A protein has these predicted regions:
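Extreme N-terminal leader/targeting segments of oxidoreductases
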Residues: 1-18, 33-37
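C-terminal accessory subdomains/tails of enzymes that are appended
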Residues: 7-10, 15, 47, 93, ...
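Short hydrophobic core segments
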Residues: 19-21, 241-251
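Glycine-rich Rossmann-fold phosphate-binding loop(s) that bind the pyrophosphate
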Residues: 22-24, 46
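N-terminal Rossmann-fold NAD(P) dinucleotide-binding loop
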Residues: 27-28
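Glycine-rich FAD pyrophosphate-binding loop
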Residues: 35-55
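Dinucleotide-binding Rossmann-like beta1-alpha1 core, especially the glycine-rich loop
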Residues: 59-165
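Helical element adjacent to the flavin cofactor pocket in flavoenzyme catalytic cores
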Residues: 182-245
């Protein structure tokens, strides 16, 4: 990415076809879709890219097996199609994972789940049906071909495996002596890194990207949205952006973008937030091995235990949330709920003190006025067009982010009378690199090469070149983890990281994996120093930024034993 300074200069000196408010997954894909169709695009993010819901997901690219319980067949089919496409477009960042549903003791086979898995298999391979929309036929031809190519990553339907194989795949099951298990496949990713990759592709097509840009007003001319005004957080300056189209892609904040005088209340969605909490655990405490496991969690609920970055990722909860959506952290009861489910199922005794990290996000569910609990509300995306012409896209799920972006840009193309087909079904999200192609004589931490290949793809070479130039940067950010100090420099120089938390929580994910080791200013002092070298911070500013990290970490609740004000 270009620097924030250069981005601001471009914004101030140009008019745009489109301004996108929100730098999460949906906003990133709107920007990429529009820019790749030839539009001039600026994307503005109030805080950091993916700082909201898009960095707090379950890290899964999946069809949503449980949505079949609500008969959301269309949503599941769409998500499964997009899942296959993401494996094609970002093979280094979206990867298949085996999922197990074990049968323990004398438990009978879950017949309903077996039926659901049969439907899941069928929906994953169903042909592509043409939808109406600008450029749709051409895209669906490409999409069908892409699905044909990528479905080979999971060539077999779900099957039943014996208990010994299940225990081999997930050692945590071994003490339980499983009789058998259903085995099926879904995909995992690093959610915030995938957003960064999409944003980099959008910039490659000409989009201008800026974080730390708080949109405070939607401008209008004769009752029509004509741009936005934002406050640049570093300087406090107010900047106006002229744009022919305005898209609100702020997710759970979508109903807060309500410009006075040019919209009716009924023209924007009413968000019903739902909080989802996750925890991470050491593999010594929960050895998940190579597989994910669906874990019963009471009252018909199920949670997941997944391998992720050398930890076991456990989640999620799904509860109505009426707190401050700008400050979402795991509740003590949610952490206890997840631990109770794990301990009950795996017959372990994992205590809160053993939790290596925790995080919570808020899903932007759209309220229908129904009294159903949030777990039963559909995750379908919705687009709203106001009398001002502003488009709002919200709801949905991470897996369908590409299609949500397409839905918005299709509408802009339609009303502008343009001829520009969607191309995002064929635009690679970064370039993959095999770990063996990145071999180096550098003395790197164990696992660093593999992690760099996953996180950056071909861009990992730039990290390694920096390590060769400055060998001290080949050291780990935190002892025992493969994340390199060079990544701090790359994040600051190339990815608009401007706070320690941007690096620790979103460019790397160390804050979610080793929260107890990163709970002091001293623990991130080297990160602050490296960022300061790039951003021109004084010694005093570097110390202040390290202290700000501690405050933010406590607000985020990444270490559930240490919270703000406690």
């Amino acid at each position: 990415m270009i620097s924030r300074k250069d981005a601001i200069a471009q914004i101030q000196s140009n008019e745009f076809d489109l301004v996108v408010i929100g730098g999460g997954a949906t906003g990133a894909m709107v920007a990429l879709d529009a820019a790749s169709r030839g539009m001039s695009v600026v994307l503005l993010e109030r805080d950091d890219y993916s700082q909201g819901t898009s960095s707090r997901s379950s890290k899964m690219i999946h069809g949503g097996l449980r949505y079949l319980e609500n008969f959301d067949v269309g949503l599941v089919r769409e998500a499964l199609l997009e899942r296959s496409l993401m494996v094609e477009l970002a093979p280094h960042q979206v990867y298949p994972t085996p999922y197990l549903v074990p049968r323990l003791g004398d438990d009978g086979r879950d017949i309903a789940l077996g039926v659901g898995l049969n439907a899941y298999d069928a929906l994953a391979t169903v042909g592509v049906k043409s939808d109406e929309g600008p450029g749709e036929t051409a895209e669906n031809e490409t999409l069908a071909a892409a699905v044909d190519r990528t479905i080979s990553w999971a060539p077999e339907r779900h099957r039943t495996i014996d208990g010994a194989e299940a225990a081999r795949m997930m050692p945590a099951l071994a003490p339980l002596n499983p009789q058998s298990a259903y085995l099926f496949y879904d995909c995992q990713t690093d959610d915030s890194r995938l957003v960064i990759t999409a944003l980099q592709e959008a910039e490659r097509y000409g989009a201008v990207l800026l974080n730390g840009a708080d949109v405070v007003e939607v401008l209008d001319q004769r009752g029509k949205a004509s741009g936005v005004a934002f406050v640049e957080q570093e300087s406090g300056d107010r900047v106006e952006v002229s744009a022919a189209n305005v898209v609100n892609a702020t997710g759970v904040w979508a109903d807060q973008i309500r410009p006075d005088g040019i919209e009716d209340e009924g023209e924007v969605p009413l968000i019903s937030p739902s909080r989802g909490t996750h925890i991470t655990l050491s593999l010594d405490d929960l050895p998940v091995g190579e597989a994910a496991c669906i874990v019963p969690a009471g009252e018909g609920r199920r949670i997941f235990a997944l391998p992720w970055y050398g930890r076991a990722l456990v989640g999620t909860t799904d509860n109505d949330y009426d707190g401050d959506i700008d400050s979402v952290s795991p509740s003590q009861s949610d952490v206890e709920y997840l631990l109770d489910a794990v301990n009950t199922y795996f017959e372990t005794d994992i205590a809160p003190e053993q939790v290596t990290g925790a995080f919570a996000g808020v899903r932007p569910l759209i309220s229908s006025g129904d009294t159903k609990k949030s777990v039963d509300i559909s995750r379908k995306a919705e687009m709203y067009e106001t009398s001002s012409g502003m488009l709002t896209i919200t709801g949905g799920k991470y897996t369908t982010w590409r299609r949500m972006g397409k839905q918005v840009v299709d509408r802009i193309v339609e009303r502008e009378g343009l001829s520009a087909a969607c191309r995002t079904a064929e635009i690679p999200l970064g370039l993959p690199a095999r770990p063996e192609d990145l071999e180096t004589d550098l003395d790197l931490p164990d696992g660093a090469i593999e992690q760099l290949a996953f996180r950056y793809g071909h861009g990992a070479r730039e990290v390694l070149d920096l390590c060769a130039e400055r060998p001290e940067l080949a050291q780990p950010i935190l002892e025992g983890f493969p994340d390199l100090l060079a990544e701090v420099v790359i994040a600051t120089r190339n990815e608009q990281a401007r706070k320690v938390s941007d690096v620790i929580l979103r460019r790397t994910r160390l804050g979610l994996l080793a929260a107890r080791d990163l709970d002091s200013a001293e623990s991130v002092a080297e990160v602050a120093d490296l960022m300061g070298e790039e951003l021109g911070w004084s010694k005093k500013r570097r110390a202040e930024e390290a202290t700000l990290w501690v405050d933010e970490a406590r607000r985020e609740g990444i270490n559930p034993l240490i919270r703000a004000g406690r």
